[in-house]
């Protein structure tokens, strides 16, 4: 099983969704992320981190609110935002990093 650090330190573009099961905006992000994944396919990896289960990881990245999205490549944070992001905005934000 890959560890979180192995995944974000890879050369692949990785979008991390820090969420909580009780969070309504997080639930709204789920289908948006599925749609983004269906559009981008293997060009991006999307993983979800439940901050109630993995609080240490959330603390490491100073996650204060959920949902928080972070984009990584080679361990570097390329982009970060909190709150719900619609599909079009998320695709437009990710596009420059896909090359």
Predicted regions and their residues:
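Short pre-active-site segment immediately N-terminal to redox-active cysteine/selenocysteine motifs
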Residues: 12, 19-22, 65
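Hydrophobic beta-strand anchors of alpha/beta hydrolase catalytic cores
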Residues: 15-16, 46, 69
